[in-house]
Amino acid sequence: MGGVALATGLGSSPAAADPRRGLTTYVLVHGTHSAGAFWMPIARELTLRGHRVVMVDQPRHGAEAFVPESYQRQDLKAMAAELSPLKGLGLEDYEARVTGIVRRAARNGPVVLVGHSLGGVSVSRVGDAVPHLLHHICYMAAFCPSRVLPTADACTAAPENANAVSPVELTVGDPDRLGVLRLNFRTGDSRELALLKEMICADYPDAEFRRVLAGLQTDEPVAAYAGRAVGRAGSWGRLPRTYLRFGRDRTIATALQDRMIAEADAFTPGNSFRVHDFPGASHIGPMDPIPVAEILDTLAA
């Protein structure tokens, strides 16, 4: 979500002399309008438990982020027209970024691939492309497309997502012309801020909500939502997989999470999701990273 933020533990010692060889590496993929740094609290916990962690920045996210000049000035008229270098990026680019990191990490031991939100489509694509390099895959309140709902767009439009809060009314500019869904996270409008908080982290204090907003970026390519991300039974479908289900999610509604889990399990009846329920969690998960990290820790080889 090539810029890659590495947590700790990726050393250069010869493999034969490196006691870390064989440790599990967690490759963490961020969601829409986000960056690898989103994962820092969870990555810190996993590192302290003895794992290696790589927090992926997808192309033009995080360390490569594009910040519109008009966004800095809060000139909304100019912001509606300013061109974006993210236009034209798609799931092929996201898949390539994550696959490259997985290939490197797998040289040193087992890899657990985890995606949040839109990061789920990358998990599905990479899991389908290189299942032999993955020990486990995990979706954290993430899109898991199916043959019936093959894209993030299709998942979002499903009736089970009717309870979700849509950012459409907050969109700046024409997504078809700009090639990106552009949102203004620096808005001072109280109604817009209330909508964003409900969508992202309704259970967080306002101060924490503002911190979350500060880490988000304006642009996400529309092609990423529209790209097909359906795993095949013989590749993606044979990987052990886990779903972290968030019960107060207003971005990917809990009912939609349940449908995606059910459709995946029906597609691979001999290999079902291991589901862990967080009934009070909103879209970005609990404020305390420890409960999530504890579950991820159990996925290690």
What are these regions (language model features)?
Residues 1-17:
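N-terminal export signals
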Residues 31-34, 117-118:
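Active-site glycine-rich loops that stabilize anionic/oxyanionic intermediates
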Residues 47-81:
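Conserved alpha/beta-hydrolase
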Residues 93-109:
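Conserved acidic catalytic loop of the alpha/beta-hydrolase fold
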Residues 110, 114-151:
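Conserved hydrolase catalytic core segment
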Residues 139-181:
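Flexible "cap/lid" loop of the alpha/beta hydrolase fold
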Residues 218-270, 274-281:
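Conserved serine/cysteine hydrolase catalytic core
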Residues 271-301:
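Catalytic active-site module of serine/aspartate enzymes centered on a nucleophile-bearing elbow/loop
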